[in-house]
């Protein structure tokens, strides 16, 4: 079996919204990489032993006092280094070049760079050719500051009209800097540049593939678990479903899946989960009906973070209780994925802020009696889905729209009550059904319904009704870090509204959320 971690790239994060995208692009190329905060120690880098290092972008100015710098060891480690945007600027400044603060002449958005000098990074890449026969590249810029003098040993590789050093290189040391963002799709040849860096310049083998990842995960699970038994909280979502299939392959009937019906699931979801994993795949599943327990625990609580923590705590309590029924259950498996780990870790410098606590990594008690098994903690969501397909899970389940770990607990605004959940389930099912019928479901990235704890006057026949309000939410996004509200057809929205008001007794008004992210988040809570 090939070692999927043998060749690897280290990405240092300076705070750019695009940093996770760099990691996903490197993984798509077939090379393992990890994303660390910029303030790592020499010892940590030596221990990781990367084949190459990428310095990512960031929002700060290299010219500002106390702005982040790459560890000096990065440039003495004897491996290729690629600086992107802020990463190029700090590389230049740290190696003896100069960076000047932008004064109203930054570049934001589409730009065309002209390649001046041959470089391993841009080998055989062009989108067009200039009048003088130089390759032109369509790229995406997002910078105010710029390099005004490159370090000794570097050459200017590319320029734009306002940026004389859009790319620089020291081919002897294999140090490269680009002022644009090769990781975004707007940079048309960006993936090829990253391929040149990872596969050719860093000489990494493309071992990071779904079948190899599965094989590696199964071997590691066997080594970690031994003859112990494992309990997994199976929700029917993508992450826990893929964990279930991996563990089933690794340890067979030593896996007990605990499916907790917390009363916060979608319509008929409990029945569907039991049918697929119990009847079809033959997993050992314990079905716990805990609706009242969750609702009682959340009674009177309206604050979103507190609700998330309560839901997480009650889940763990139930797992603890179920584990006591399995004499050898020493492990609790979770569907934690890599973005959860990144966002919850933050930086030692305190520059990362918690926007929402993650269901899988927040709220676990310190005295939890089981060890944690997290076979997906190295993987991005798109990788988890590809692995799920390889393991035989159905496409329509793996590519269903995201559903939050706390479920309807954060889609009912304020205090969660059974009545609200029941109404929301019915309204949401109508919305999703109509999206499928209109062939719109796969054209939006996420769609759902939110219950608003406000009443509104309505008229039904000759009678007046005073009932609840729901909001429809549909967004389009590539990475869920930014999103646009989906411009669904008016007649479609009208049809959904009419069906909900006529078929769901207790809802009198339907509204449509037209907020983007930012400033709003995709979920309301």
Curated annotation (Swiss-Prot):
UniProt keyword annotation of NADP present: no
Reactions that this protein is recorded to catalyse: XMP + L-glutamine + ATP + H2O = GMP + L-glutamate + AMP + diphosphate + 2 H(+)
Pathway(s) per entry: Purine metabolism; GMP biosynthesis; GMP from XMP (L-Gln route): step 1/1
Function as written in the Swiss-Prot or TrEMBL entry: Catalyzes the synthesis of GMP from XMP.
The species this protein was found in: Shewanella halifaxensis (strain HAW-EB4)
UniProt key word Membrane: no
Residues annotated as domain Glutamine amidotransferase type-1: 8-207
Protein name stated in the entry: GMP synthase [glutamine-hydrolyzing]
Subunit structure: Homodimer.
Ranges for domain GMPS ATP-PPase: 208-400
The encoding gene: guaA
């Amino acid at each position: 079996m090939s070692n999927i971690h043998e060749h690897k790239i280290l990405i240092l994060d300076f705070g750019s919204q695009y940093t996770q995208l760099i990691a996903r692009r490197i993984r798509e190329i077939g090379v393992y990489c990890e994303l660390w905060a910029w303030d790592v120690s020499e010892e940590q880098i030596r221990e990781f032993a990367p084949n190459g290092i990428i310095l990512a972008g960031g929002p700060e100015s290299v010219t500002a006092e106390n702005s982040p710098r790459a560890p000096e060891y990065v440039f003495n480690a004897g491996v290729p280094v690629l600086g992107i945007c802020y990463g190029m600027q700090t590389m230049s400044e740290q190696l003896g070049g100069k960076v000047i603060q932008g004064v109203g002449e930054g570049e934001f958005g589409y730009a065309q760079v002209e390649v001046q000098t041959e470089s391993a990074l841009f080998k055989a890449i062009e989108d067009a050719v200039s009048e003088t026969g130089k390759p032109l590249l369509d790229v995406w810029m997002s910078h105010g500051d710029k390099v005004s003098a490159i370090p000794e040993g570097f050459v200017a590789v590319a320029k734009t009209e306002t940026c004389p050093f859009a790319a620089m290189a020291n081919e002897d040391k294999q140090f490269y800097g680009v002022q644009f963002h090769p990781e975004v799709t707007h940079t048309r040849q960006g993936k090829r540049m990253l391929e040149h860096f990872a596969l050719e310049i860093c000489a990494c083998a493309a071992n990071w593939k779904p079948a190899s990842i599965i094989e590696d995960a199964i071997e590691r699970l066997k080594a970690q678990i031994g003859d112990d038994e494992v309990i997994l909280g199976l929700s029917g979502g993508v992450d826990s479903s893929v964990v279930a299939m991996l563990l089933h392959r690794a340890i067979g009937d030593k896996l007990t899946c605990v499916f907790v019906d917390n009363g916060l699931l979608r319509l008929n979801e409990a029945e569907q989960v039991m049918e697929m994993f119990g009847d079809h795949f033959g997993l050992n599943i314990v079905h716990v009906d805990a609706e009242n327990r969750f609702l009682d625990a959340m009674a009177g609580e309206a604050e979103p973070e507190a609700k998330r923590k309560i839901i997480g705590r009650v889940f763990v309590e139930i797992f603890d209780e179920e584990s006591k029924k399995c004499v050898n259950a020493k492990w609790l498996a979770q569907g934690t994925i890599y973005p959860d780990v990144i966002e919850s870790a933050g930086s030692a410098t305190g520059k990362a802020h918690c926007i929402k606590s993650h269901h899988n990594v927040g709220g676990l008690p310190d005295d939890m009696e089981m060890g944690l098994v997290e076979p997906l903690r190295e993987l991005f969501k798109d990788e988890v889905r590809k692995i799920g397909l390889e393991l035989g899970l159905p496409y329509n389940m793996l590519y269903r729209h995201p559903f939050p770990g706390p479920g309807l607990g954060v889609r009912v605004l304020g205090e969660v009550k059974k009545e609200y959940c029941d109404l929301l389930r019915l309204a949401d099912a109508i919305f999703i059904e109509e999206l499928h019928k209109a062939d719109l479901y796969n054209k939006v990235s996420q769609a759902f319904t939110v219950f608003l704890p406000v009443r509104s006057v309505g008229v039904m026949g000759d009678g007046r009704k005073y009932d609840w309000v729901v909001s429809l939410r549909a967004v389009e996004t590539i990475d869920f870090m930014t999103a646009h509200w989906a411009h669904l057809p008016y007649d479609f929205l009208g049809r959904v509204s009419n069906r909900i008001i006529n078929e769901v007794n207790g809802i009198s008004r339907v509204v449509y959320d037209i907020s983007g992210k930012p400033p709003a988040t995709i979920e309301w809570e």
